[in-house]
Amino acid sequence: MNLRNLILLLILAIGDVSSAAGRPNILWLSCEDISPHLQCYGYPNATTPNLDAFAKEGVRYTHAFVTAGVCAPCRSAIITGMYQTSIGTQHMRCSAKLPDHVRPFTKWLREAGYYCTNNSKQDYQFKTPSGTWDVSNAKAHWKNRPKDKPFFAVFNYGGCHESGLASEGKYKTVTKGLKPHDRDVVVKSLPPYYPDTPIVRDDWGRYYDVITAMDRWVAEKLEELDEAGLADDTIVVYWSDHGVGLPRAKRWLYDSGMHVPLIVRVPEKFRIDGQGKPGQVSDQLVSLIDLGPTVLNLAGVKVPSHMQGLAFLGPKTPSPRDYVYGARDRMDERYDIIRAVRDRRFKYLRNYEPFKTYYQYMNTPEKGRLMREIRRVEALSDISPGVARFLEPIKAKEELYDTDADPHEMHNLAADPMFAAELKRMRQAHLDWVLQTRDLGLVPEAEINARQAKLGSAWAILSNPDAGDLISKLRDAASLSLDGPKAAAKMIETLHEEDATIRYWACVGLGNIAREIPTSQKDKAAIGLQVCLKDKSENVRVAAARALCHMDFAEEALPVLVEVLDDGTQWARVHAANVLDEINAQARPVIAAMKRNKAYRKGLVAEGKYTVRVLNRALNELEGTNNTVK
């Protein structure tokens, strides 16, 4: 090789190294199930010296929120930059099919030359596409990257997951390195929706303990960067996947479930237009759906146009958000469709199933000490107004909170004339979002599965060219179901709509007002619902059966529910089991069928355990037993 060629190769090699060095490494430190209960966020009970110091080196965001109050739907939104309700990943432990254009954002990072690792939680609710990560397992680490590549690395801390509070063994394992003074937390106050008892105070103290353990883990990960001499080359993002892992927080859309810590440290060389100044506190509204687009923007990669998240750091960022949005759908074995909109001050909630109690019996939280304590004081009728509020049998159709004056969201302002303008504004923001994002949560789950099998993805159900104005009709039908007896005639008319999802909401609405349907409309309603018992859609049949049971036509409706239990698809069976639990004593004639179906089935998600859980609960209530299932 002559000297000229050697020099040329050296120049090219140096150029490659400079290119890699010129782009930031990006490190995510994620944890589970905590709200911003860190000392740097103003909580003196927290022992978080490492995160407090980290916040002084970066930007602490005070208004960061997730898109759901539980991990898997949130994580699907974070990794794709798409609302879970747009791509069909909103139901807990579902399995959505993605359209070809939607992929984990790491695909574009890897194409741009980044080495991408994940250690190690995925939990995306869809099959992870090949090529998403260079490595994704418990040994994945940025240290193993090729020397000429920048990295994007994710480490997840699971020690503060709700299981760390509920399981004595896990709690001891997670906190075994803490000194006695680290555990010496004096819980001065509790959220007003919890009973003030020693057990609840102990659980809240444990919550602070696992946060302290997590803080030490953060220190270890930051120290690794320092030791490698990469702190000045690496943007570090710390976040939690949702709020506190305790009742009325996890799985819920109150700030206790949606509000999360977010701290970003940007080395000086990567700061743009004053972004990322050390010690800065930002009240900009951020949704964690924005994390993926932000990483791409910081890495110099074009953000795909289909992404719904908005980059909040890097060059040419879009205008800050006016609102963040959240969605609750099926949580394990229980359906409860709720939507949330929040600005910097107000929170709006739309309860699409207000006739379901707040605390539906759900296996996992009911095993926790705090939920058991709530049930204990409920049985004794020894409850404060704050606790009683969330034990009411039904919910309001709409909720509105001034989070500045009422941070625990205890005082619903939706009926207060002084806040009528705010209610109207926030309600419209929700309705607009349903249309703009094509909210699949309004499509019953069994119907989603059937349609995505034909169309290739859940996204296509409301977004393919043939969908037309289905989302508009769906939004209106779901809203109509909440309008009470005055809307009975319109609901009956809607029973004859062409699309099953619209018929479904008409059945739901009539079931909600079953005993209040105007006398002049009762016969028409009963006849229309009886026709729906033979509908081709499982969800329509189940919803019609529910309505007829509440109209005292259980003799005709129960065989339909049993048929779905016996031979229906997985999520239709869960739906039918929930209706049998709801109608309580009316289900006595089919106890034998319920017992027959309280069995695990091979080939279903988790062997159909959600149907088993609901039927077990219903049978315990009917027979006065206390049987348990996994």
What are these regions (language model features)?
Residues 2-9:
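Sec-dependent signal peptide recognition
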Residues 5, 334-336, 396:
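Short beta-strand-initiation
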Residues 12, 17-392, 407-428:
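Formylglycine-dependent sulfatase
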Residues 21-24, 496, 509:
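…; additionally, a secondary subgroup of soluble metalloenzymes is captured
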Residues 396-410, 437, 464-482, 508:
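C-terminal substrate/ligand-recognition segments
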Residues 404-461:
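Long, contiguous interaction/recruitment modules in multidomain scaffold/adaptor proteins
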Residues 468-485, 501-519, 531, 539-553, ...:
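Structural detector for internal amphipathic alpha-helices that build alpha-solenoid repeat scaffolds
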Residues 484-496, 516-533, 554-566, 586-599, ...:
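Amphipathic alpha-helical scaffolding segments comprising HEAT/armadillo-like alpha-solenoid repeats
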